[in-house]
Each structure stands twice: as C-alpha cells, then as structure tokens.
Amino acid sequence: MSKRTFQPSTLKRKRSHGFRARMATVSGRKVLARRRAKGRARLSA
C-alpha cells in the first residue's frame, strides 16, 4: 500500500495559492484578472 500524497496544510495552501501570493507577482495578478473576467465566486484559495 502506498501512502496518500495529499497531506493538507492551510498555511502552505495560503502561502502558495492565497490572494496575497497572487497579488505579489505580475503573473499572479493576471491569474486574478482572468478569474474576475470569468466571473469566479472565489478568486483564490
């Protein structure tokens, strides 16, 4: 049996995919812009 590879951590999740992480880079801002244009209810994790 192999172990489950997804070991959730709220801190790691927020640091890599959170709103402030997105806003920190130009490409991250583009991600948010695309999601706003698409009409997503949640822009980031």
UniProtKB/Swiss-Prot annotation:
Stretches with biased composition (Polar residues): 1-10
Alphabetized GO MF terms: structural constituent of ribosome
BP GO terms, sorted: translation
Biased composition (Basic residues): 11-20
Domain of life according to the entry: Bacteria
Keywords: Ribonucleoprotein, Ribosomal protein
PROSITE patterns in alphabetical order: RIBOSOMAL_L34
Cited Pfam families: Ribosomal_L34 (PF00468)
Region (Disordered): 1-26
GO cellular component, one term: ribonucleoprotein complex
UniProt cross-references to HAMAP family, sorted A to Z: Ribosomal_bL34
Family of this protein: Belongs to the bacterial ribosomal protein bL34 family.
Protein name (record): Large ribosomal subunit protein bL34
Organism for this UniProt entry: Shewanella woodyi (strain ATCC 51908 / MS32)
Organism ancestry: Bacteria, Pseudomonadati, Pseudomonadota, Gammaproteobacteria, Alteromonadales
